[in-house]
Amino acid sequence: MSDKDRITQLLRKLEEAKAREEEAKAREAQERCEKERLQLEHRKTTFLEYLRNCHRHLYNALRLTDTSRSSTGYTKVVGKYYPKRLRPWTNFTNVLHPRYFDLVQKICGQRQLFEPASTTKNLGTIISDHLAGNEKAIDRFEVDAVERPVQGILKVLATHEEAGKAYRCPEFRFSANLRELTQEDDRSSGADDNTSDGSLERRQQAGPNKRPTSKRKYICSNRQPDGVGIRMQPGGGQTQAFIYDYKAAHKVAIEHVRSATAKEHLFHEVVARINDDKLSRDEEVQRREQAEAFIAMALTQVFDYMITYGVSYGYVAAGRCLLLLYVDRDDWQTLYCHPCLPADDVGEPTNDWTDRLSHTAVAQLVSFCLSSFQSEALEGQSLETALSVAKATLKTWSESYADVAYLGLEPPELSSAASSQNTENSEYTSEAKPTGRKVALRSQSSCKPAAVLPQGNEHDEHDEDHSEPGASRSRLAANKRKRGPSSGGEDEDIAMADPEPTRQYCTQACLLGLKRGKDLDENCPNVSLHRFDGSSRHPVNAHRFTDMVKQQLLLSPYKGCRMVDFWDKRGAMGWLFKLELFPYGYTFVGKGTLEDRLSRLEHEGRVYARLDHLQGDVVPVHLGLVRLDRGYILPGLEFVVYMMLMSWAGQTPSASMADAETLKRESLTAIWSEGVDHGDDNRANYLWNAERCRIMIIDFDRAHLFPPLKARAVSRLSKPKRKRETPNSYLTEITGREARYVFKQMDRSPRATPSHGG
């Protein structure tokens, strides 16, 4: 081989070696990049990274079905409250959202607190595998793509001590699976939720100067939103922060959302078109008008929920958009709306999304939640007072606001398609500015009642036939109860508020002594109020006690009566109330239920009668049943009409209580021996009573009564002697459910062993 060939060969080998080296380096770089990518995808993410991932992998994963295959039909809103005006929620857009977004960004910083990108990618794949064509599909999408991330971010804020206190960031959850507590168990779930003509007629016939005597004062339709934002109170208990509803994406057409929500008189136009039953001949105009009708009805439904559940905040979730809503309690007739359309506002993905991440659905809903936490939900007397104002101020679909024409709106028969389209590419601007409040958005106290209506010539609408005397004054009193006293010194208004129960619960021994006619219990925290003229006896007997409670609640269902917790302290058919009997200071609880569930409370009363000698020890002291003629209002416009009076049983046993199950079995054995099968193994029905040092059992509405075991044994001894019975022959006369308990008791207690002749 010549030198030239040798050199050529060496050069070729050198080049091959360099190529292999470069290839190895490239492979190493690729492996390193892949490793870094995997590490990046599997490590937790920062706040901004998480927002980007949620939008890219979850929100953009939504796939909609062809509208021809989607659910059809209008939202049922007949008889529901709707606002007169729709205005942009500029305070949220310009003040609240920027403030809260900056707050969350500051608290989270660059800490890696949230789900890895791989998790959101995998979930996004699952979302994209299912087409969404109805509310149920949107429900699943909203939970995965929006609600779960929002809840995770709020959880981080709740653990931040400074932010938790300063901005009232509590523990929070979306409750989208509400039990239908307002319907009887056997009631058809497909019942129409519209108000009947009879209900509307009764509502219209209600006298303006009469005190409310029944729930017929209001619209009596079943109101059950798709979901409620539930926040945990610092001192325990839960309350609603906002209401939300899911809508199929095609029912809130995103191409018409901005133009429709920019129309101040959207509701009037839609109601007028429906009442006149007039359709445009232009197909394009028809599509727009139908889209506006769908949007107006979706907004009306949530607005009605906001009013009747006593909250100022709500939203409509329709997949491609969120409609964030707010109503000021100083102006019930105006609904403020912020349309959130992330696909348009965020745009196509780029390398740097930082300046647009605040427009994502998750970011905007976080700010919405934080805004709602600054407002207290109305309940009890304040809710009823507010609804009195709403009833006098608002119209129900499809009644018309008589004075809308005087605001400069053309009658529907004179309006043209062109005039209706003027707002399609513009945003509404009104001379009447939004309130501009930054956080609380509450009414200002003054020496005069706040005006229900905005300034102008709108007062002609509400004459004597539609208003109630003192409604505004009552509302001021309600506001003061919820928000605390002001510096205005409205002593007269504050005096209008019914006193709430404030004392500790009476002891079991105290209320048992009252029922049995025995001496006072000196250990009762309220014994000084029970004692009259230095006597050691109770000032009233059990019958007089029940009658006095009834008379006190007849004057007002809110006098000395307060619902403990609508969302937490509730059973299968009732809610828990704390009561105080004035002036004797007896403090106890009531189990309240709806008018059509009286039979279940009566059954529970019969169970307590069977367990009479166990009252105050194994079960609470039963003090009778009363009717509230006026009814105690609940969120959603239902009324507690009947209430069973009892002693307070105690608290749920702590998880660290080692012998809780043993004590529970002892109490179950005790009631079983009296012929009662509890029939409800819910943990909330077994409470630790420190006074008696045992587990007390409550809620007997599902209990089954059977002859006590002792009575059976005596009955068998009195019969002629026949062939010797075995335990199995004895059990053939008992139901299968009873048999299981008998077997257990035969193993534990001689009292449960059946007697045999011979």
UniProtKB/Swiss-Prot annotation:
One Gene Ontology cellular component: cytoplasm
Main location per the UniProt record: cytoplasm
Coiled-coil segments: 4-41
Domain of life: Eukaryota
Record field: compositional bias (Polar residues): 416-429
Localization in the cell: Cytoplasm; Nucleus
GO-annotated biological processes: meiotic drive
Region of interest called Disordered, as start-end residue ranges on this chain: 180-230, 414-499
Keywords from the named record: Coiled coil, Cytoplasm, Nucleus, Toxin
Keyword Cell inner membrane: no
Coiled coil in keyword set: yes
One annotated GO molecular function: kinase activity
Function recorded in the entry: Promotes unequal transmission of alleles from the parental zygote to progeny spores by acting as poison/antidote system, leading to poisoning of progeny that do not inherit the allele. May possess DNA nuclease activity that leads to spore killing, and a kinase activity that confers resistance to the nuclease activity. Can suppress meiotic drive by the P.comata SPOK1 protein.
Protein name: Meiotic driver SPOK4
Species: Podospora anserina (Pleurage anserina)
